[in-house]
Regions:
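Active-site-flanking beta-strand signature of metal-NTP-handling nucleotidyl enzymes
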Residues: 6-14
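Short coil/turn motifs at secondary-structure junctions
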Residues: 16-18, 48, 60-62
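GIY-YIG nuclease signature motif recognition
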Residues: 11, 23, 43
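Short, surface-exposed ligand-recognition loops at beta-strand->loop->(often short) alpha-helix junctions
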Residues: 14-24
Length: 109
């Protein structure tokens, strides 16, 4: 597998009633901040249902993941959490076992 995707985060976000558009706007705006993080390989803001959103991102190593967790998007997420979310964001760490990335064939880690 490419060295750009060894570990990941999946963040589940449940919007408060009436805050769905604000959560969507927050995720769209977060892209500009993440683009300034050299160790964040891939980043996706997701809508899973009418009120459930998510973030999936990948990193080349644990140091990159920790840098992201200490970065501007994470700070903004936690600052806005009480206003936007029905419950605290659920942040799950994952190890990437296999991936198909642009410009590469399927490979196991």
């Amino acid at each position: 597998m490419a060295d750009t995707a060894k570990v990941a985060l999946f963040v589940r976000l449940e919007a408060k009633p009436g805050k769905e558009a604000d959560v969507e706007q927050f995720l769209r705006g977060g892209l500009a901040l993440v683009q300034q993080e050299p160790a964040t390989s891939l980043w996706f803001g997701l809508r899973l249902s009418a009120t459930t959103f998510g973030i999936f991102d990948t990193f080349p190593n644990e140091a990159g993941r920790q840098a992201h967790l200490s970065g501007e998007v994470a700070k903004a997420l936690m600052a806005k959490a009480p206003d936007l979310f029905a419950q605290p964001p659920s942040i799950e760490k994952a190890e990437i076992l296999a991936a198909k990335l642009p410009g590469s064939a399927n490979k196991a880690a």
